Amino acid sequence: MTIAKMIDHTALKPDTTKEQILTLTKEAREYGFASVCVNPTWVKLSAEQLSGAESVVCTVIGFPLGANTPEVKAFEVKNAIENGAKEVDMVINIGALKDKDDELVERDIRAVVDAAKGKALVKVIIETCLLTDEEKVRACEIAVKAGTDFVKTSTGFSTGGATAEDIALMRKTVGPNIGVKASGGVRTKEDVEKMIEAGATRIGASAGVAIVSGEKPAKPDNY
């Protein structure tokens, strides 16, 4: 598998414009990225632009705080699927995890998994920068129990992004059959190679073109 086919080509900033989405989808077609990862408002346009392409549309749920109710997250998933999303990256209820309310954390994830079942792949963002190692392990275990397809490090909108150490811990926790996505601060081919070596099977990056072409990103970006 090429590096491009492991990358979710990402544009999640609040000021993202239509022109930027059109560029993102054009690049996805050109380079063969796994997906474009966009905010829900851009799912329909992205799906139209990628009609017939190998790249699919990924969107974010409960993003970036994870503090919506399970019911709202489930509705977001259904709406995104109606608009053409094939993958959804949800943020867990981080406060509930820290409160050790594992039942709520699981119910929250399961609401998304159930809404997406048979229609979209689910990635669960645990926001590693806000968690202890014990909490990272627990979050991954709950996500697997709830039926996720992937666990994912970060939103790119908090205090830190992906590290090889966190990827290795997540991979060890979920085993070989669940995907692990590294996101947040992955900007170069070298960054990607470190993440893959640690166990990542998907990369979230806004610098996808720079990564596959070996160029430096135009400017630093958290995502």
UniProtKB/Swiss-Prot annotation:
UniProt GO molecular function: deoxyribose-phosphate aldolase activity
Pathway it works in: Carbohydrate degradation; 2-deoxy-D-ribose 1-phosphate degradation; D-glyceraldehyde 3-phosphate and acetaldehyde from 2-deoxy-alpha-D-ribose 1-phosphate: step 2/2
Keyword ATP-binding (UniProt): no
UniProt cross-references to Gene3D superfamilies, sorted A to Z: Aldolase class I (3.20.20.70)
InterPro entries: Aldolase_TIM (IPR013785), DeoC (IPR011343), DeoC/FbaB/LacD_aldolase (IPR002915), DeoC_typeI (IPR028581)
Top EC category: lyase
Compartment annotation: Cytoplasm
CDD domains: DeoC
A GO cellular component entry from the record: cytoplasm
Keywords: Cytoplasm, Lyase, Schiff base
Presence of the UniProt keyword Nucleotide-binding in the record: no
Domain of life: Bacteria
Catalytic residues in the record: D89, K152, K181
SUPFAM superfamilies registered for this protein in UniProt: Aldolase (SSF51569)
Catalytic activity: 2-deoxy-D-ribose 5-phosphate = D-glyceraldehyde 3-phosphate + acetaldehyde
One of the Pfam families matching this protein, by short name: DeoC
Subcellular location, principal: cytoplasm
GO biological process: 2-deoxyribose 1-phosphate catabolic process; carbohydrate catabolic process; deoxyribonucleotide catabolic process
Family (UniProt): Belongs to the DeoC/FbaB aldolase family. DeoC type 1 subfamily.
Function: Catalyzes a reversible aldol reaction between acetaldehyde and D-glyceraldehyde 3-phosphate to generate 2-deoxy-D-ribose 5-phosphate.
NCBIfam families with a match to the protein in the record: deoC
UniProt-listed PANTHER family: DEOXYRIBOSE-PHOSPHATE ALDOLASE
UniProt name for this protein: Deoxyribose-phosphate aldolase
Organism of origin: Listeria innocua serovar 6a (strain ATCC BAA-680 / CLIP 11262)
